[in-house]
Amino acid sequence: PDEADVIAIAGMGGETIIHILENAPWTKDGSHQLLLQPMTKAADLRRWLSVNGYTFTSERLVWDKGYLYPVLCVKGGSCPTLTEKQLLCGVKLADDPLYGDYLALHAGKLHKTAAGLRQSRREDAAQRAAALEALAEELEKERGSL
């Protein structure tokens, strides 16, 4: 732990990154900057980080082989409660040149998930679909204002 100031964990899923950090509690002491690049489950990773003693210092987006990935920079510290939009689309990405693309990507996924829920017979499916559509519309509105 004392041999590095910056630690990069990249190229794996958010769940795997969470597992690594759960087994390295010293990363929360505030003396290490973590560069995290989840290939999947970025929202789950953001949620876990925010409730487990990490604060977001910056975020950036990168295109790689046709995919858009977030790079999260965090360190130990308290984090305010994140909104669903922040969990999904990032905490510090508003100035990123690829942010509009990221919003469009997530809005499309939300619309697709909502359409699937509308086919469901589950009792809460319609309510959940409406919430996802509302979030998708919020993302599209923000993208339009960029």
Which residue stretches match the model-derived regions?
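A short beta-strand submotif of the Rossmann-like class I SAM-dependent methyltransferase core
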Residues: 9-10
